[in-house]
From Swiss-Prot:
Residues 346-447 form the BRCT domain. The keyword Nucleus applies. Component of the NOP7 complex, which is required for maturation of the 25S and 5.8S ribosomal RNAs and formation of the 60S ribosome. Signal peptide: none annotated. This is Pescadillo homolog. Residues 461-497 are annotated as: Disordered. Pfam families: BRCT, Pescadillo_N. Keywords: Nucleus, Ribosome biogenesis, rRNA processing. Residues 479-496 have a biased composition (Acidic residues). Gene3D superfamilies: BRCT domain.
Length: 606
């Protein structure tokens, strides 16, 4: 007969530990326990039976793995936290007694813990660290935009700003930026580092206020970990690229609001390669070179071959050449020079032939980062800060990024000539060119014009709306209209007819969705008669469906009958979401092409 198990000594009661018992076991405060869990990556678990895990109690509580708590008990950071607690008691006692010399001595020798070992434990390889850098970048860029308060010291903000600038400098140098999206929360960037996609969010440059209900202590603990992680990653990236880390900062440029231009990237100066010489080793007072070692090895092999009759005699000519052969050093696979010599794609140097100038109302840090990441040259007015490579009157400027309405004003002949030689575009043109991977036409993005929809480039699921592959064709947006105004109107009618047909095909089964398609067609400028004719035509086609469609529907119904209730609900949910996506794609196509056709008509009228 097996031994009886005592209640609460095995199973879930042994594998899980409540938060209260974990704090008692570690002998630390709740704040220190939270900090340890954040730094070590330990989070609450949900047992199958909360009552069994809590030894029969049904009180609400948080559970942790017992092995995780035992893992925390040997953490060096926990030891430093205990030392800091004792240090705080001694310091308060010395200040209370007025012992200023001892208090100063305690302050100079206060315990400080490091997180290097935690980074190595949580991220064994460099690729693991790069995969988990998204949250670190978002947190660092967030704190870099916050004002300093009593809870946020200036040193912390300066360190976050420095890390953010170093990351942007590396992205610009390596030309790793791939996608950009302007949202309400901020600017989403996506880069490709070591074949890993990294996405982060940068808030707009507005005055930020920390809400009172936000626990800053928890965020500061995360920031402490993320700063160390980002420092490790940047050091590795800069070293592999052959750059000095940290990049030197020019204090004068920084004081004059030069931004990331205050940092200078410097290549690592490698010593000149000396001619290869045979390494000499002293043995019993006599120098032995590598040639002597090779000769000794050959003699040993020759002696073995004489004793073994099965081994064939080697050619003496080849033997002499092998003895005289010198060691040839091979290039390392992680040579920093090889990384910069890799061929770059055309999209990474998208703006290299162009020179941009920022108007005063456009955000300089955002668009300077975008343009320089794709090889372009950019300048700005003196009100943005120092460091502009050229002035507004420079004749090499090809594009002016402007975000103000078009207002008529008197211009001198020289100003008019300068304006005609440049192209004035709105900021969205830069972002859409980056996401499409090519230079788009400047016409729809001209100054004062209604912009086309700015869609997220992160919708990569199958069936997502692609503006370049709409009913107008992949190159329909890029083609210039060289015909007269009447030909443009005829083409618009044909395109609108195709749009209506694409929309109606997706929604003819539901009257509510059909009404939505009718409103969308009306907004696109299609009359009701044309829309009604398309609906009737499609209904007739559906009535003349072949019998095979009915057979397929019957097979689907039979398969559905064999499903369980859970599988049926999942199948219906999947079909509903698929149909909803098709409707959204059709509506997006109608609205976008209506805007594009109106902008093309406006260009021809002009």
């Amino acid at each position: 007969m097996g031994r009886l198990k005592q209640k609460g000594k095995a199973g879930a009661a042994k594998n899980y530990v409540t938060r209260t018992s974990a704090i008692k076991k570690l002998q630390c405060s709740l704040a220190d326990f939270r900090r340890l869990c954040i730094l070590k990556g330990i989070f609450p678990r949900e047992p199958r039976s909360r009552k069994r895990a809590n030894k029969g109690s049904s009180a609400p509580t948080s559970f942790y793995y017992a092995k995780d708590i035992a893992y925390l008990a040997h953490e060096p950071v926990l030891k430093k936290l205990r030392e800091h607690k004792a240090f705080a008691k001694k310091l308060s006692r010395a200040l209370g007694r007025g012992e200023w010399s001892s208090a100063k001595n305690l302050e100079e020798n206060k315990p400080i813990y490091r997180l290097d070992h935690i980074i190595k434990e949580r991220y064994p390889t460099f690729i693991d660290a790069v995969r988990d850098i998204d949250d670190a970048l978002c947190m660092v860029f967030l704190f870099a935009s916050l004002p300093t308060t009593t809870r946020l010291p200036p040193e912390l903000m300066e360190n976050c700003s420095r890390l953010a600038a170093e990351w942007q400098l590396y992205i610009m140098r390596s030309q790793s930026l791939r996608k950009v999206f302007l949202s309400i929360k901020g600017v989403y960037y996506q880069a490709e580092i070591m074949d890993q996609t990294v996405t982060w969010l940068v808030p707009y440059q507005f005055t930020q206020n920390i809400p009172a209900d936000v626990d800053v202590r928890v965020m500061l603990t995360f920031l402490e970990l993320y700063q160390t992680l980002l420092g490790f990653i940047l050091f590795k990236l800069y070293t592999d690229a052959g750059l000095v880390y940290p990049p030197p900062l020019d204090a004068k440029k920084d004081e004059s609001a030069a931004g990331i231009g205050a940092f200078s990237l410097q290549d690592i100066t490698q010593p000149a390669a000396q001619p290869s010489r045979a390494k000499a080793v002293e043995l019993d007072g006599r120098k032995i070179s590598t040639k002597d070692v090779r000769q000794t090895i050959k003699n040993i092999e020759a002696s073995h071959s004489t004793h073994d009759p099965d081994v064939e005699m080697s050619n003496p000519e080849t033997a002499t050449t092998e003895v005289e052969e010198e060691f040839i050093s091979q290039a390392s696979l992680s040579n920093p020079g090889l990384i910069s010599s890799l061929p770059q794609s055309l999209s990474t140097s998208l703006f290299s032939p162009y020179t941009f100038f920022l108007s005063r109302e456009v955000s300089r840090p955002i668009f300077e980062f975008m343009v320089r990441s794709f090889g372009g040259k950019i300048g700005w007015s003196a009100s943005f800060g120092s460091g502009s490579p050229f002035e507004e009157t420079d004749e090499t400027i090809t594009h002016v990024i402007i975000d103000r309405p078009l207002v008529g004003r008197e211009e001198s002949p020289s100003q008019r000539e300068l304006r005609l030689r440049r192209k004035y575009v709105q900021p969205q043109w830069i972002v859409d060119c980056i996401n499409s991977g090519k230079i788009l036409l400047e016409g729809p993005y001209g100054q004062g014009k209604t912009l086309p929809p700015h869609l997220s480039p992160f919708g990569e699921y199958e069936g997502a709306y692609d503006p370049a592959a709409g009913p107008l064709g992949p190159s329909g947006v890029e083609q210039e209209s060289e015909s007269e105004a009447d030909e443009v109107s005829e083409e618009d009618e044909e395109d609108q007819g195709g749009l209506v047909q694409a929309a109606v095909e997706a929604v003819t089964g539901d009257p509510v969705e059909l009404r939505a398609a009718e409103l969308a067609a009306e907004a696109a400028g299609v009359d009701y008669g044309t829309f009604e004719a398309k609906v009737k035509k499609l209904n007739k086609k559906q009535m003349k469906k072949p019998i095979t469609d009915g057979v397929e529907d019957g097979e689907k119904d039979m398969n559905k009958m064999m499903m369980s209730n859970k599988q049926k609900k999942l199948y219906e949910k999947m079909k509903y979401s698929q149909k909803k996506k098709e409707i959204e794609v059709s509506k997006f196509g109608i609205s976008l092409d209506a805007v594009l056709t109106s902008s093309i008509a406006g260009d021809t009228d002009y």
